[in-house]
Amino acid sequence: PMNTREIVSEPVHFAAMMVLYGQADAIVAGNMKRVASVFRAVNKYRQDPVPTKPLFAISIVLVPEFSKKFGGRGVYFLADTGVNPEPTVENMAYFAVETAKMARHMLGKSVRVAMLSASTSGSVPELAADRTRAAAALAKSMVQKDCLNNEISIEGEIQIDAALSSDSYSV
């Protein structure tokens, strides 16, 4: 077991305590730690015995080459790519909206959200696409409820090629 000094000197534990005590809103862990070790630290200090909000990860990917081809800055925020193996429709919507809020805050501009699937607008009838479509509809209603329609645009279910380029997208 780690003693108090060792715990506080471990950045991920210190960050989790900062969130616990309201000194931070989130933890940025980078790629120097495994996701599991970050979530173990967070769960160690989490106070709510029955969590009302699920934990999830946001990955920020910079692809400057994409800005030339697809427009924008080439900055992509990916919601929960490796934490929750089978999120519910409600969780997927929550992850999408919260990730969009963080992206909007960090970029200082309105953002577009693509709820990625193997299907675009029902082109492939499958359960996973149906779940993604339902999550997109719920996310849109959450954005509307929070009066963020002008700040966050949600599209889905949609395949990645269609999400990146409107030239690929025709319904």
Feature annotation, model-predicted:
Residues 1-171:
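Anion-binding alpha/beta catalytic cores of soluble intermediary-metabolism enzymes, centered on
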